[in-house]
Design a protein with these regions (language model features):
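Cytochrome P450 heme-binding "Cys pocket" and the immediately downstream C-terminal segment
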Residues: 308-310, 445-482
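Cytochrome P450 heme-thiolate "Cys pocket" and heme-binding signature region
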Residues: 283, 288, 347, 421-452, ...
Length: 495
């Protein structure tokens, strides 16, 4: 099992919660408790080496709010759902996004992930309706079609990196969903390859001394990024041009780009997006829409390989929902061979795959693809009795909150059955937030849920995975929570 930090107690947590904007004051600030060292940058080095372990230890030791410094930078870690809700929903205008996402401007321009203020709010009003569940259901067949092609390519008994496979399939799916049936196969492949290059580039920039990379243009990684960006720009702008020409000829499309091209902000009386705005939003959807889901699926398959009883119940549900019967396993009910003939899952099956949904939800609790959210205060801000000064960095970690025993008993145990309707109803809103929340929450959340459930059902319908015991599993928390060394799995075909 992958090693991870955990709370051993939550006795240090306070239940009080009060946040608000605060005025600047000349009085000496009272800081919350937190780790301090006489050695400069000691904590920063610990955070760079193992950020999740560091944040977990701080949360366990100091409770709902902790203060520490990275060099001269004041940092606050919030571990209370109410505090997080106040920042992400009620007082979001008091904060801007932290450096990690600003780095992405190199590719994304002023897309939803990187933009701020009124421009961000306007773009969100334009884009969010295009990603509503009722509109994205039409992409379900694309998801299962790519999954089937991948399953047919696999061979029984081989060992492969399932993380790489998930990156490739989610890249292909998002390319097809956004750019549609008119995209050529070589263009789709080009999008996937270029996205991988860009994702790796941004992850490198966020590593220690990553800012130095940009200052040496001749480095291969910089040249590779520029080539990938140029390729993506060429494909996206050409597709925008083609879609506009089709529109002028009254030829409609069913892809997301066509929907975005039609969208406008009726509330503000602002017309359609320009080519440049469309380009930025398409790039944002590309980058945000493949790696997070790929990581979530990778961790899901890993957890299933470690819990054969859960995997067996998953396969039984698949057979019941998609085959009108129960799995008749010749291997003693362990999810092995089955005589049940099953059909391909559809969007209409998603609500019926209840245990599949619980598995995906629990996987994202244990290994949230977006493992922390950072904000920078642009004004002084009050949390409980403490004033957070303008310029401070605020961290709100999904990983930390999702492993808090106050909200999840035995948080280090993979237990999909914890997700009862009653549990989901009574959990504080930001005790579980794999997709963020508020005005800056992930607009693609419905797409991700549908994609995750359909891919799990389609793949596990045909294959069982066994984790390579010789393969080391370790967390790699960069922009998203990746497996550091990939995820080696041996494939077993169901017959």
């Amino acid at each position: 099992m992958v090693k991870s930090s955990s709370y051993s107690s939550c006795s240090s947590y306070s239940s009080s919660s009060s946040t608000s904007r605060a005025s600047s004051s000349s009085r000496r600030l009272e800081y919350p408790p937190g780790p301090h060292s006489i050695l400069p940058n000691k904590l920063l080095r610990e955070f760079i080496n193992n950020p999740i372990k560091t944040l977990m230890e701080i949360a366990y030791t100091y409770g709902d709010i902790a203060h520490f410094k990275f060099g001269r930078q004041h940092v606050y870690l919030l571990n209370n759902p109410q505090y997080i809700e106040d920042i992400l929903i009620r007082n979001y205008k008091t904060f801007i996004k932290s450096r990690g996402l600003q780095v992405s401007k190199r590719l994304l321009g002023d897309g939803l992930v990187t933009s701020e203020g009124e421009y961000h709010d306007r773009q969100r009003r334009i884009i969010q309706p295009a990603l509503h569940l009722d509109l994205i259901k039409k992409y379900g067949d694309i998801m299962t079609s790519f999954a089937l092609n991948m399953c047919q390519r696999w061979q029984d008994g081989i060992t492969l990196d399932i993380h790489k496979e998930m990156i490739e399939i989610t890249s292909a799916i998002i390319s097809k969903a956004v750019l549609g049936s008119n995209i050529k196969s070589e263009q789709g492949g080009g999008v996937g390859d270029a996205l991988l290059t860009c994702a790796e580039y941004f992850n490198r920039l966020l590593m220690p001394f990553g800012e130095l990379i940009e200052k040496i243009p001749i480095l291969p990684i910089n040249k590779g990024f520029q080539r990938a960006k140029k390729k993506l720009d060429s494909i996206v702008y050409n597709m925008i041009k083609e879609h506009r020409e089709n529109e002028s000829r009254n030829v409609s499309n069913t892809d997301l780009l066509y929907t975005l091209l039609q969208a406008q902000d009726t509330e503000a009386g602002i017309g359609r997006m320009t080519d440049s705005q469309l380009r930025d939003e398409v790039m944002t959807i590309f980058l945000a829409g493949h790696e997070t889901t790929a990581n979530a699926l990778t961790w899901t398959f890993y957890l299933l390989s470690q819990h054969p009883n859960v995997e067996a119940r998953l396969y039984e549900e698949i057979c019941t929902v998609l085959g009108n019967g129960n799995a008749d396993s010749s291997s003693g009910g362990d999810g092995g061979s089955s005589s049940i003939k099953t059909r391909i899952p559809t969007v209409e099956d998603v609500p019926k795959l209840e245990f599949t949904e619980k598995i995906f939800r629990e996987s994202m609790r244990m290994y949230p693809p977006a493992w922390t959210i950072g904000r920078q205060a642009i004004n002084d801000y009050k949390v409980d009795k403490y004033v957070i000064p303008a310029g401070s960095i605020i961290l709100m970690s999904q990983y930390v909150m999702h492993h808090n025993p106050r909200y999840f008993s035995d948080p280090d145990i993979f237990y999909p059955d914890r997700w009862t309707k009653e549990t989901k109803l009574h959990l504080p809103r930001f005790s579980y937030f794999p997709f963020g929340g508020g005005i800056r929450g992930c607009v693609g959340e419905p797409f991700a849920w549908m994609e995750g459930i359909l891919l799990i059902a389609t793949i596990c319908q045909q294959w069982k995975m066994h984790h390579d015991a010789s393969h080391k599993v370790e967390l790699k928390p960069l922009i998203t929570l990746r497996p550091k060394y990939g995820m080696r799995m041996k494939l077993e075909r169901r017959s």
